[in-house]
A protein has these predicted regions:
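Aromatic/His-enriched, Gly/Pro-containing loop or helix-boundary segments
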Residues: 1, 29, 231-245
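Generic structural signal for well-ordered, non-membrane alpha-helical segments
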Residues: 3, 7, 35-38, 245
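Structured alpha-helical segments in the cores of large, soluble enzyme domains
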Residues: 2-14, 217
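NTP-handling and nucleic-acid-processing catalytic cores
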Residues: 16, 20, 32-232, 236
């Protein structure tokens, strides 16, 4: 009834504007004829094997507990918390020894429980930088800025690679250390800020989802419809995601 009320309002408005049309035979997506046609065509497509069930990240309102269309999303400048995180390498990194870490930077710390990969750009230069007893892998270009932000002033470069050299190396999840995740390649990685090593959570972002699909990494989102972490988030279970920041 609500939708049909506004159909009538629109129709009368168009008539007053002098617009011609089949006003008594409107094109309505809620009409039984339209719905039955969609079902029939969908069935034909299904029979070709082109339909499958999967998961992907979408815009979601935790207050309304409903999906949002792109047209409903508005962006505003805001200050977000950011964090540098080191993921301990799970496989040998050429030219290094001891404790080696891939360092990421993110402005969405709450997505870290859903981390499933670290993305690097295949063509960027990366360095292994030793500081004390630890070695950090990050973009050669961004390293000075990142190290300064991390409060590290005494360091040396012990090895260099391209992103392609790092593909398929592994690391241990920072929250779930028994989980081993891969280093993958992604053209979405930039040198605008951060470390050139990008925290990748396919269940929380479109670019992460796309690059994850290329590597067969299924999206994972330990968050319920109210924006609260589920038991899959470990010690963060029960917290609203933004408060977890």
């Amino acid at each position: 009834a609500f939708a049909l009320k506004y159909v009538d309002n629109h129709r009368e408005g168009f008539k007053r504007l002098g617009i011609t049309g089949e006003w008594e035979n409107p094109y309505l997506t809620l009409s039984p004829q339209y719905v039955s046609t969609i079902i029939r065509v969908f069935a034909e497509i299904y029979q070709t094997g082109a339909i499958y069930r999967g998961l992907k990240p979408i815009y979601w309102c935790p207050n309304c507990e409903t999906a949002l269309a792109e047209a409903e999303v508005e962006y505003a400048d805001k200050t977000s918390p950011s964090i540098y995180v080191k993921f301990k390498a799970g496989s040998p990194v050429p030219g290094t020894s001891g404790d080696v870490y891939f360092v990421i930077w993110t402005t969405t710390p709450w997505t870290l429980p859903a981390n499933l990969a670290v993305s690097v750009h295949p063509d960027f230069d990366y360095s292994a930088i030793k500081a004390g007893n630890e070695t950090y892998i990050m973009s050669s270009f961004l390293a000075p800025t990142a190290l300064e932000a991390m409060g590290i002033t005494d360091y040396e470069t012990v090895a260099k690679f391209t992103g392609k050299d790092l593909e398929n190396l592994t690391y241990r999840h920072v929250i779930f250390p028994d989980k081993v995740c891969p280093v993958i390649l992604g053209d979405h990685v930039t040198l605008d800020a951060g470390t050139g090593c990008v925290h990748t959570a396919p269940g929380h972002g479109h670019e992460d989802y796309v690059v994850g699909m290329k590597y067969g990494i299924a999206p994972f989102s330990p968050v319920n419809k109210s924006g609260v972490f589920t038991n899959e988030a470990g010690s963060y279970a029960g917290q609203f995601v933004f408060k977890a920041n």
